[in-house]
Amino acid sequence: MNKRLFAACLSVGMLLAGCSAKKSTTVKDGTYEETVDGRNSKVTVSTTISSGKIINVEVKDNEETPEIAGTAITELPKKIVEKNSPNVDGVTGATITSDAIKEAVKNAIKTAGGDPDSFGSDSAQASESKTEKLSADVVVIGAGGAGITAALTAQQDGAKVILLEKSANIGGVSVIAGGPMGINSKEQKEAGVAGTFTAQEVLAHWQSYNCWMDDGQLFYNIANRSGETIDWLEENGMDLVYVGNEQAAHANGFPTYHAYADQSNKLGYYQALLKQFENAGGKIYYQTPAVELKSKDNKITGVVAKSSDTTYEISCDAAVLATGGFGANADVIEKEVGFPLVTFTTGTQTGDGATMSQAIGAGKGKTIQQYHGVTSYSGIEPGSGKDEIAKAIYLATSIWVNQRGSRFAPEDLNYDTALSSNAAATQGEYYFSIMSDDMVKKVE
């Protein structure tokens, strides 16, 4: 009897112990600031918690690129507050910044004594997916510089255009660049430069510099109409200034460079073009990547795109693939290039256009390369603190030797990254940069 009573008491005791273990820890109200690594720098985020809920999130100190991370900085905090959870989808194209913001909020919850995974669990509901059918004359996939200008041109020519952008931002890598190159633009004519060189001469110089590992016909087609394209951009609100040559490394090249007049407003120029597109009747869908091309008898008949809660089936007569390259796709880079590289992208250039077009029978284009800037190797992420050492390796601060241990270039002629890759390209897969301990410590 006593044994049975003891066993019963023990069972009740275990049950009570089990219940008490599930009791949630009280989260302390307050405002918590957490600093984590972002894309370019440290990111400081302020999180306010009240009565067990996230009531405010604010990104404070940071040096993230506004044109790329701006939407993540302004919109992701609102999303976290709305869902009462840091476990929300980030902003496509600003993944690193998004992850930093979410990590900072999670750290704030932990500091307050809470469990980040328990926040929002009661209210989180999966939204129902729906299908919507649309139609257009032209679907432009990608709202970078090429996509926006293509969409606006088609809309101005009387076509009904739908523009799809996989991220929350427009501009693509065009907002990272300093400006376009052009031959025989109005500004060059005013400067007395137009007519002093031809597209064919620029092409010859370009191919020689790139060891003929490019597509000459494609380059010529672009270069031959580059002047009138720049004139068109300016007629439609973009403010460009003819510079000639920006970098000392290009002093012996052709003066083709046109810079954005206001380098702090690069995104604004493309927003102005987009506004014209929308005013003319065009429609843009953000965070809605195209996932499939439809075709019949070797002709495009439609595009399938997906947002977070809607699948769009768009019938069309033509599709413009302005998705960029594959610079943000590490697997494809290693497959095509042969080794890992960290390139300057907005994170959205993952080869979508090639993947979709090849799925319906398109051929694989020529693999081309441009010997221009040098990028970080072996996974050195910008903003990690190690990228400064990487820069010191390929800038004119050290001695370069090839695999035989011989110097192969006058390092002081490589004024910046512009000539580094061209000089190194003749040396095989890799070369060595010799630095002293003092040099490394100085950079660190």
Descriptions of predicted regions:
Residues 354-356, 363-444:
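An anion/pyrophosphate-binding glycine-rich loop and adjacent beta-alpha core
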Residues 314-381:
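Glycine-rich loop(s) and the adjacent beta-strand/alpha-helix scaffold that form part
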Residues 286-299:
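A conserved short coil-to-beta-strand element within the FAD-binding core of flavoproteins
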Residues 128-146, 162:
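Beta1/beta-strand and adjacent pyrophosphate-binding region of the FAD-binding site
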Residues 169, 175-283, 400, 407:
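Conserved N-terminal/central alpha/beta ligand/cofactor-binding core
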Residues 156-177:
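Glycine-rich FAD pyrophosphate-binding loop
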